[in-house]
Structures are given as structure tokens and as C-alpha cells.
């Protein structure tokens, strides 16, 4: 197969903050209340520092080469992109250095890592599974979308290993370690059906479970297709957008089309639905669940407008395009407690809505960081589930078209944000409330595969 890998680009040795299309537009009252300060063409709270930025570079710098999700392992960050993925050395977070950039088009290239393996989600028909395959749209043959698997033992030269086709492709996937230590499972989420498509037949009220033998990744295959709901959701759309697993607790929370779903994953191949929750008044597109450390709360997001609309402007209700905080009881039942939305009003042409985030490992507190597209990066304290509040933020000014932070995750003392058009941002929060998190070091992070930290 054709695989273009660009390794060790020295241009990243001295990353600089790029100029945005225009100046920031933070609501003055919100900025003042947060102790905001300006830094070049960005605005941030006084407790947040913009440490570094690595702008997009070839071959992942085309007009549709959008930055997407993130994963971490040791001193490396892995950044998905509509056109492939990048590997960065972040041993010095102030100077991220490119190790390799792999050209492998397939939107949206949602990414995860485990040991020497890297996984990518492809949710757009291709003429084949390899990286050289053309798009299957616009009259092409179509016929493949799903999961691509790479060997990353040599991070300067990632190697394509195999691929697995899944119905309706893979919009996102969640890595769940097998209990025998010899396999990992990927819970594959995607919307559907598409009646005219050869890759997404009706009905589509399910997910796909892909089993990957870690010693033989070429043997990866679909081992089950659990049905999570009866029929398709609203407007005939079924399936799930994404799933967050908490393997230690044998739990997963799925954000699906029409509802949130709590699952028992003690049997990795056959997850069992425990509860459906709906919010017909405030939620549109369920998205991005996050458990707290004790698994006594779950935060769901509402991606109203699909990430391309302005839902943080004055014309959108504060509980729309927001987060909802649920209690999770010992009996494993969800109960709605409160809502959160960033307090900084955005312009009517800035795409902004709740998106991907992760916990900060602060003992005794429930704190997470989250991306909000052009609304920036928000640090949220939801310890009081009835009254979640923002305690820090980072935000650029408006850009033309779709932009902003796709994913923002905390990893070993820093926040890493994948900006759709501006590249990789590294942030640091210095605050007595969050400083205990700096003492916690982990070896690997896939944000949708939660692990516990010391209480």
C-alpha cells in the first residue's frame, strides 16, 4: 500500500503561537469575572498559560485537513486529522516536536493507542481500506469504511497492519482492554442508516464490537453487533455517536441518537443495556460522556448543530448545546442534576458547542477540561452537580468558517488541545484547586477509556 510518512520535522523545534484571523471577542463581563488576560490574539483566564502551539504542516495542512482527536502514550501525543495523523514528542511540553506525520485520508480519523497499536476511525466510504484508496463518494465504487490498524513500535515510521469493515463505518471508537490481557476490543459507533449506501444498510440501531488480538492485529474482526435500542432514533437516524468506557467499573456510557445509554460491559463482547435516559426539552445530539473518578456522576454533552453551528450566541438558550450532569447511583441508575454552558457569549458566526473533554486527576474533586470549538477550552468544576462552574478557560478570536478546539484533554500536568485549523495547543493551569493533579502521572491516555486515579 502507499503510505506517506514525514518524519522528524525540525520546523517544530521552536513552536510559535500563530496569528488568528481576527482578534478575540470574549464577553467583557465573563472575562472580568474569570480574571481574564489577553495574550497576543488569544484570551485566557489568569490561571491558564498558553505554553506552545504547533501549526499544521505538510502533508496534513490542506484545506480539509482538520485536526480531530488526541491520544497519549509515554512522552508522545497522537493527533488525528481528516487526512491522517501526527505523532509528537511532548517530553518537553513547551517544545513539542514532530516525530512523524502520516498521510492517510479518511474522515474523521478518531484515534486511540494501546501498546504498539494505533487505531483510526473512518466514517466516509473509501474505495478500499488502505491509505492510498480514493474516496468512494461522487460516483466511486465505495464499499469500505471502518477501522484502520497501525503498528507504532517505531513511532517515526508507523506501519499499516490491517483494517476491519464495519456497518456505517466508524465515526468514533472506544478502546476497551480485554480481561485476559491478550486482546483489546473496539466499540465502534456510527450514525445510520443511509438507504442509498452500500456500506450503511437499515436498520442501524446497533454498535459493532471489533476484537483485536494484540499479538496478531491482522486477525482483528467484528465479533458482535449489539442492538442498543428498538428501531432507529429521531428522523430515522440510529446508532451512537460515541461511547465512554470505565473498564475498572465494568461500565460504559453511550451517547446515542435520541438518548444516553448506560451499559454493563463485564462481558466485553456482549455489553448489556442498563438504562436509557432522554432529555427532549434541552438535548439534541447526545455526545461525549465523562464519568467522575468514583463513577458516581456522568457528564453528557449536547452537540446541538453538529459542531458547525453557533449555539453559544445570545439567541440560543443556556441549556441548549450544553453539558448535563447526572448522578449515578449504587444501583447504577442515572438522575439529572444540573447543566453547564460556557459563560462567554460567542459571535453569531462562531461554531460553538460542548465537545470532547477529560477529567483532571484531582483527589476529592470532580473537575474536567473540555473543548467548545470556537468557544475554546473550558475547565469545569462539577463537584457540586447542581451548580457546575467554569474555573478557567482559553479562547482564540473568531476565525472564518469552522474552527476551534475539537478535543481538549489533561495529560501529565498539561492540557493538550487539537484545534481544527490552528494545530496542537499546549496549555497549563496553575490553580490551588487543580494543582494536586500535577502529582499524578499516567503511561497512556485514551480519554474515552477512563482509568481511576488515587483518591
Language-model-detected regions and their locations in the chain:
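Feature marking well-ordered beta-strand scaffolds used for ligand recognition
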Residues: 3-5, 9-455
